[in-house]
Every structure is written in structure tokens, then in C-alpha cells.
Amino acid sequence: VLLYGHLDKQPEMTGWFEGLGPWTPVLKGDKLYGRGGADDGYAAYASLTAIRALREAGGKHARCVVLIEACEESGSYD
């Protein structure tokens, strides 16, 4: 099983709501707003954490390959 994730974020942009900037996460109600919150940066962490939890619980799984890159997934040059 291939688990893919990229760590890059989109460039800082305008259009944020008042009090919501691109670099400081803010909790409003039950929602967390922050830079890259809707991007893929935490998918790799979630995948690795899930594999670890499964192993610690004694579960079995197929061979997992985790691919993490730091470039934009639509135009990776390296």
C-alpha cells in the first residue's frame, strides 16, 4: 500500500477573514483555522500514526510504503 503526502503549502494569499492570518492557527467554535489546514501537509503524519496505532494494537496490515515529498505535487521538479 502506498501512502503519499506532501509537506508544501500554497503561497500566502489575501482574502482571510479579520483576525485569521496565514501563520497562526485560531480556534473558532469547533473549527480550527490555519495555514495549510485544507492542504495535504498532515496526511503523512496521519498515515504514520495510523500504522503505529495498528501495530501497537497487534493488528496486521499489508506492506506499507510511505512517500513524503516537500515540493508541490502538481509540479514536483525533484
Which stretches of residues belong to each language-model region?
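Active-site metal-coordination/substrate-binding segment of hydrolases
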Residues: 2-65
